[in-house]
Regions:
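Active-site-adjacent structural elements that line small-molecule/cofactor binding pockets in enzymes
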Residues: 1-300
C-alpha cells in the first residue's frame, strides 16, 4: 500500500514556508510514497457554505501557500515520491496556465505528478476569482478537454464555450504521456459520472472518526457503473484516499483508518493530512507523526 502525506502548507505552517522543503526531504527519507497539496484562497468571515463534512470553516485556511509553488519545491528536493493535488479547483484557472504549470512540475519532478482536480464549493472563493459558481461544472468539463489538448501532440488547438486557443505549438509537455494521471474529487451524482467517464481515478476523503467503508465503496460502485456505460474498463480506475485529522487524534487511530481502508475498501493508496485542524504543530512534529504512522501501517 502506498502511504503519503500533505505538505505543511496551511495555517501556522504557511508562515514558515521553509518547512515545505524540510518536510518533503525527510518524508522521502522515511519512505513516504507521495506528497500532497490543497487549494484554498481565503476563509470568509460569514461563509455561505461550510467546509464539507464540518459545521465551520477551518481557521487554518486563513493562511495557505500557493499549491503550485509548494509542489515545485517538493519536486526539486525529492526524487521518488509522487506529487499530488487534492485538489486544485479547476474552474478557477485558465486551462493553458493550468496545463503549463502541471507540465512544468511534471518535468521538474521527472514525471511524478498526479493531477487531482475538483469543481470547488466555496461561493466566496468563486466570486474572488471572478468565475460564476453556476458555471463550475461546464467549465470543469471544458477544462479537462483543454488539458488533454495542451498535453497532446502539436499543433495544440481548442475551441470551447469559455476558452479558445488558435492552432499553435506548445512544446513543454509532461514527462508522463499522454499526461499526468487525472484524479477527480466528486460528491454529487454528476461529479461521480464525470469521474467514471473522464478520469483515471477518484479522490474520496474521510474526516476524523471511525472509518466507514461505504464512503469509498458506495461512490466507487456508481463511478465504475458510469465508466462501463462510457465504454471504459471500470477496473482501470484507481482510488486515492485523503485522511483528514484533527488535534488530539492518536497515531494508532490514524493508522487504523488507513488499514481499514486497505482491508475493507480495497484502497491501495492513501495520504494523511497531519496539519489539518492543527494536529501537527511544527514540521518536526509532523515528521515524527508521519514516521510513526508509516511504521504502524507497514508493520501490518
Amino acid at each position: 500500500m502506498r502511504i503519503g502525506f500533505n505538505l505543511p502548507q496551511f495555517g501556522s505552517h504557511a508562515h514558515h514556508p521553509e518547512g515545505v522543503a524540510e518536510f518533503a526531504r525527510r518524508a522521502e527519507e522515511m519512505g513516504a510514497d507521495s506528497l500532497w497539496v490543497g487549494d484554498r484562497l481565503l476563509a470568509p468571515l460569514e461563509p455561505e457554505v461550510n467546509y464539507p463534512g464540518t459545521t465551520a470553516f477551518p481557521a487554518e485556511f486563513r493562511a495557505g501557500l500557493d499549491p503550485f509553488a509548494a509542489l515545485t519545491v517538493a519536486a526539486v528536493v525529492t526524487t521518488r515520491p509522487l506529487l499530488g493535488s487534492s485538489v486544485l479547483v479547476a474552474p478557477w484557472y485558465a486551462p493553458p496556465l493550468l496545463a503549463r504549470s502541471l507540465a512544468t512540475i511534471d518535468q521538474l519532478s521527472g514525471g511524478r505528478v498526479i493531477a487531482g482536480l475538483g469543481a470547488g464549493w466555496s461561493p466566496e472563493e468563486f466570486r474572488a476569482v471572478g468565475v460564476p459558481m453556476g458555471e463550475r461544472g461546464s467549465r470543469f468539463d471544458e477544462c479537462l478537454d483543454a488539458l488533454a489538448a495542451y498535453w497532446g501532440t502539436n499543433p495544440v488547438e481548442h475551441h470551447g464555450r469559455f476558452w479558445t486557443t488558435a492552432a499553435g505549438y506548445v512544446d513543454v509537455k509532461p514527462v508522463q504521456r499522454p499526461g499526468p494521471p487525472v484524479y477527480l474529487a466528486a460528491f454529487t451524482p454528476a461529479g461521480m459520472t464525470r469521474v467514471g467517464r473522464r478520469a483515471d481515478g477518484f479522490l474520496p476523503a474521510v474526516t476524523p472518526g471511525p472509518f466507514e467503508p461505504t464512503i469509498v465503496t458506495g461512490p466507487m460502485s456508481r463511478i465504475r457503473a458510469a465508466a462501463a456505460r462510457a465504454g471504459r474498463d471500470p477496473h482501470e480506475l484507481g482510488v486515492i484516499l485523503r485522511v483528514n485529522t484533527m488535534a488530539g487524534d492518536s497515531v494508532h487511530g490514524i493508522a487504523e483508518v488507513v488499514l481499514r481502508a486497505r482491508d475493507e475498501a480495497a484502497v491501495d493508496h492513501a495520504f494523511v493530512d497531519l496539519t489539518y485542524r492543527d494536529l501537527a504543530t511544527s514540521v518536526e512534529h509532523a515528521v515524527d507523526l508521519a514516521g510513526r504512522v508509516l511504521d504502524l501501517v507497514r508493520a501490518r
